[in-house]
Amino acid sequence: DVAKALGNPSKAKTIVFSMKVFDLAHLILKDEYLNFPEDIPIPVDYHVRNVAISSGIVDKYAGDDDVRRAWMSVLSEVNSRISRRVNLLRIDSVVWQVGKVMYKNNFAIRSLIFICLL
């Protein structure tokens, strides 16, 4: 509905991010995440894109849809290994933080290794 009202595709970063903010507000008020479908797209931004490339889940940047598909594959693997189902908004939260630290440290591999050890 938000996407239609704004005339944007539902996978647009602004639309997905607004859903994420709504989800976080709901978490603060109700102490639980909203039940979004697993196929909700990840909001692709600079950090999410660069972690996808740096991690090797995409060979090279050919568009945001490739990045979304790669993170969807990661989500499928995560959900096959844990007892609880998560969606890409949960993965985005972690990926974005990793990407931010990588950027602050000029993508130094030592910074990424340090984060992974935390």
How would you describe each model-predicted region?
Residues 1-118:
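C-terminal accessory module of base-excision DNA glycosylases/AP lyases that mediates lesion recognition
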